[in-house]
Swiss-Prot record:
<feature type="glycosylation site" description="N-linked (GlcNAc...) asparagine">
    <location>
        <position position="161"/>
    </location>
</feature>
<feature type="transmembrane region" description="Helical; Name=4">
    <location>
        <begin position="130"/>
        <end position="149"/>
    </location>
</feature>
<keyword id="KW-1133">Transmembrane helix</keyword>
<feature type="transmembrane region" description="Helical; Name=7">
    <location>
        <begin position="259"/>
        <end position="281"/>
    </location>
</feature>
<feature type="topological domain" description="Cytoplasmic">
    <location>
        <begin position="201"/>
        <end position="226"/>
    </location>
</feature>
<feature type="transmembrane region" description="Helical; Name=3">
    <location>
        <begin position="87"/>
        <end position="109"/>
    </location>
</feature>
<feature type="topological domain" description="Extracellular">
    <location>
        <begin position="150"/>
        <end position="177"/>
    </location>
</feature>
<feature type="transmembrane region" description="Helical; Name=6">
    <location>
        <begin position="227"/>
        <end position="249"/>
    </location>
</feature>
<keyword id="KW-0919">Taste</keyword>
<keyword id="KW-0675">Receptor</keyword>
<protein>
    <recommendedName>
        <fullName>Taste receptor type 2 member 105</fullName>
    </recommendedName>
</protein>
<keyword id="KW-0297">G-protein coupled receptor</keyword>
<keyword id="KW-0807">Transducer</keyword>
<feature type="transmembrane region" description="Helical; Name=1">
    <location>
        <begin position="10"/>
        <end position="32"/>
    </location>
</feature>
<feature type="topological domain" description="Extracellular">
    <location>
        <begin position="1"/>
        <end position="9"/>
    </location>
</feature>
<dbReference type="Pfam" id="PF05296">
    <property type="entry name" value="TAS2R"/>
</dbReference>
<feature type="topological domain" description="Cytoplasmic">
    <location>
        <begin position="282"/>
        <end position="309"/>
    </location>
</feature>
Length: 309
């Protein structure tokens, strides 16, 4: 049985997961409908669709994995189930981080304003940058998959039990975990770098506009401030996701500490939930579609009230 604190945290995580699935499903559907309507999908539309779809899977894996560990620990420790979940998690996590990285770099190259020759060279070659990122995904996934298979083969016994035996020493597990996630860590560094550089560019540009005296300047400055806030929020949420996942991994060595494990789950679930809301509110296409949905619901509700009277 769960304690009161554990139950509250698990409820919060479940609500976050539900909102994350709804928000990302909405983003995926909007871009899918745009694809069907225009017979093509823009780069940003493709990235948003891929990010939303992969995060739906991530949310389901996070929440189902947590419920299995908390309420069905005996079945969860089976070797075959652990291997399947590990492979699916590794693949989907790579996809999620890659789409987030690509989206960050795409916005950076599109919006940022630097005079450095490397930036200008990259800005003129977005297709090559996109292809390079795709190769990064494939290579990092292949490396991670090979290490995952190697670790699984070297631990045929007690595969689901990280707390006993000599095969899963903490030091060995930590080194294996870093090697398995070296590609994801590299993508994380690229994402943070692109976001920080974009924040610097927007901040410099907003300061330059402060010398102008016009209402147009005020609108531009406000837009830049909103963009900076969005980027800072994304960075915080993205880091929280990795912290939450790391906490869940650490809990493999202390399975009796359910509160810490659920705290990690709650922390990790914040990112797919809140970032989808931020995307809907800041992306004009998604925001318009969301407003139409709300208007449709309001019209339907008014129609029911009229029929009732």
């Amino acid at each position: 049985m769960l304690s009161a604190a554990e139950g509250i945290l698990l409820s919060i995580a479940t609500v976050e997961a539900g909102l994350g699935v709804l928000g990302n499903t909405f983003i995926a559907l909007v871009n899918c409908m745009d694809w069907a309507k225009n017979k093509k999908l823009s780069k940003i539309g493709f990235l948003l669709f891929g990010l939303a779809t992969s995060r739906i899977f991530i949310v389901w894996i996070l929440i189902l994995d947590a419920y299995a560990k908390l309420f069905f620990p005996g079945k969860y420790l089976s070797k075959s189930l652990t291997e399947i979940i590990s492979c699916i998690w590794m693949t989907v996590n790579h996809m999620t981080v890659w789409f987030a990285t690509s989206l960050s770099i795409f916005y950076f190259l599109k919006i940022a304003n630097f005079s450095h020759y490397i930036f200008l060279w990259l800005k003129r070659r977005t297709d090559k940058v996109f292809a390079f990122l795709l190769w990064c995904l494939l290579i990092s996934w292949a490396i991670s998959f090979s290490f995952t298979v190697k670790v699984m083969k070297s631990n045929p016994k007690n595969h689901g039990n990280r707390t006993s035996g000599t095969h899963w020493e903490k030091r060995e597990f930590t080194s294996n975990y870093v090697l398995i996630n070296i590609g994801v860590i590299s993508l994380l560094i690229m994402t943070l770098t692109a976001c920080f550089l974009l924040i610097i560019s927007l901040w410099k540009h907003s300061r330059q506009m402060q010398s102008n005296v016009s209402g147009f300047r005020d609108l531009n400055t406000e837009a830049h401030v909103k963009a900076i806030k969005f980027l800072i929020s994304f960075i915080i949420l993205f880091i929280l996701y990795f912290i939450g996942v790391a906490v869940e991994i650490i809990c493999m060595f202390i399975p009796e500490n359910k509160l810490l494990f659920i705290f990690g789950l709650t922390t990790a679930s914040v990112y797919p939930c809140c970032h989808s809301v931020i995307l809907i509110l800041t992306n004009s296409q998604l925001k318009q579609a969301f407003v139409k949905v709300l208007e449709g619901l309001k019209f339907s509700e008014n129609g029911k009230d009229l029929r009732a009277t």
